[in-house]
Each structure stands twice: as structure tokens, then as C-alpha cells.
Regions:
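Short alpha-helix
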Residues: 162-178
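N-terminal, positively charged/glycine-rich alpha-helical extensions of SAM-dependent methyltransferases
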Residues: 1-15
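Class I SAM-dependent methyltransferase SAM/SAH-binding core
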Residues: 46-97
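A short acidic, Gly/Pro-enriched loop at the edge of an enzyme's catalytic core
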Residues: 96-108
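Short, glycine-/aromatic-enriched active-site segment of Class I SAM-dependent methyltransferases
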Residues: 139-161
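A short glycine-rich, Lys/Arg-flanked "PGG" loop and its adjoining helix->strand segment in the class I
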Residues: 121-136
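Conserved Class I S-adenosyl-L-methionine
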Residues: 183-241
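Conserved alpha-helix/loop element of class I SAM-dependent methyltransferases that forms part
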Residues: 24-41
Length: 241
């Protein structure tokens, strides 16, 4: 996917308002959209499931390196993060088994990863624990069209226990965990839909230019049509401890 869309270390679908030119811009815009929910960018911030480190690196526009933490379950991705964001605290750690002390962070950001966690509830409970009073959690996430979808890709998705039926159920989960001032926006038409159309267009352009063959075209189209069918709302959320 990165090859087709020209990503530069990002691993997210992006935010695509009118005028967005490419995937890299969309990925940056999604992070910026989330950071707008943190008006005072001070103190310590944690980048959960930081991927290859592009999002962590961009946090350095707002925070000194010593105040930026990043975690990922993949040692390889943490090595990349350490290269892209030198001076930050990049650690191999499971998002549902975080070992930080209580009330350690002022802010937490998590971009398109919570649907991988076993489970969201455990992650939210731990995030609530390690946030300072008044601290904020901001994240983007996707819900799936049915609980059974979680069984289709067991290597990527947790059990159906992680399934949430609706945006209202998503909001309620935050409140049950103890978060307040919960805001959940449904932005599928500005996140997934334009990304999907961009990807399909690029695939056909590469095929027409003979850069890929018919088999690769059909395999990738099948994958993306399946992703479109299995995903439901794409959400952006902000909550305060």
C-alpha cells in the first residue's frame, strides 16, 4: 500500500478534506486534526502504536524530545521510530499492558490502532490510569460492520469481544471507563472514502502504465473492496480524565 500511495513513514488512512493532494498530506492532516483537540501542547505526550515513527517525529514540532514518548509492540518499528525521532523515548510495549506510573502523561495520541488492541476497553482503562487529571486522550479509529468480521483476519484483529455496534456505543465505552467531556466524530466520508477512491485510482493508473500486472491489480482491488465492506464508521475521538 505504501508503494502505491507514496507514504513517507506514515501508516494511517489520513484525513482528506477538499484540496488534499496525496496520501502523505492526508496522513499529516489526520494527526493535525487530532492535535487540534489538545489546545495547550505542554508536558508529556505519549504516541501509542507509533508505527514507523513519522507521527512521533511530527510531535517534535510542538514538544521537546525529552517530553515525547512512543510505544509499539514491534521492535522493528520502534527501531525505525528511534531513527526518525532521535531523543524521544521509544519503547517496545503493549498498549493494553502499559507499565508507566499513574498520572504520568498530560496527553495521549493514538492514530488508527485501537481496533487492533485486545481490547479497546483495556487500552482505555490503562490510558485513563496513566493520564494526569485533566489530561486528554485523542485518537482515530474504525468500527467494523459486524462482530464476525474480527474472525476474518485473526493476525490483525482481536476477538469479536472488541466489536462495538455504533458510534454511540463507542462514546459510552469511554464514559464507562471514567472519561469525561467525550467527543466522538464520525468522519468516514473524509477519511476512508477519499482514501479508498485514491487507492483504487492509483492502482488503475499503475496498471495502465504497465507498472503492475493483472494479477497484482485484482489482488489489491479485492483486498480494498473487502476492507470497504468490513469497515463501518471511521471516528475521531477526544476524552478528558
Amino acid at each position: 500500500m505504501a508503494h502505491f500511495l507514496g507514504e513517507e513513514g506514515f501508516r494511517n488512512i489520513g484525513y482528506w478534506p477538499p484540496g488534499t493532494l496525496d496520501q502523505n498530506q492526508a496522513s499529516e492532516q489526520l494527526q493535525d486534526y487530532l492535535l487540534n483537540y489538545i489546545p495547550e501542547k505542554k508536558g508529556r505526550i505519549l504516541d501509542v502504536a507509533c508505527g514507523l515513527g513519522a507521527t512521533t517525529r511530527r510531535l517534535l514540532k510542538h514538544y521537546p524530545a525529552e517530553n515525547v514518548w512512543a510505544i509499539n509492540i514491534s521492535e522493528k518499528q520502534i527501531e525505525s521510530t528511534r531513527t526518525l525521532a532521535p531523543g524521544c523515548h521509544a519503547l517496545v510495549m503493549n498498549a493494553v499492558e502499559m507499565t508507566f506510573e499513574d498520572a504520568f502523561f498530560d496527553s495521549i495520541i493514538c492514530i488508527e490502532a485501537a481496533f487492533h488492541f485486545e481490547t479497546r476497553r483495556k487500552f482505555l482503562e490503562d490510558a485513563q490510569r496513566i493520564l494526569k487529571p485533566g489530561g486528554r486522550l485523542v485518537l482515530s479509529d474504525t468500527l467494523f460492520s459486524a462482530a464476525a468480521r474480527h474472525t476474518q483476519f485473526p493476525q490483525l484483529l482481536p476477538s469479536p469481544e472488541n466489536h462495538l455496534e455504533s458510534v454511540d456505543a463507542y462514546r459510552k465505552l469511554f464514559e464507562e471507563v471514567g472519561f469525561r467531556s467525550v467527543v466522538v466524530e464520525e468522519l468516514r466520508d473524509l477519511i476512508w472514502k477519499p482514501h479508498f477512491l485514491r487507492f483504487v485510482t492509483v492502482l488503475h493508473e499503475r496498471f495502465a502504465d504497465r507498472e503492475i500486472g493483472i494479477v497484482q491489480l485484482m489482488e489489491n482491488l479485492a483486498m480494498y473492496y473487502e476492507l470497504d465492506a468490513m469497515t463501518g464508521p471511521w471516528v475521531v475521538a477526544c476524552a478528558e480524565k
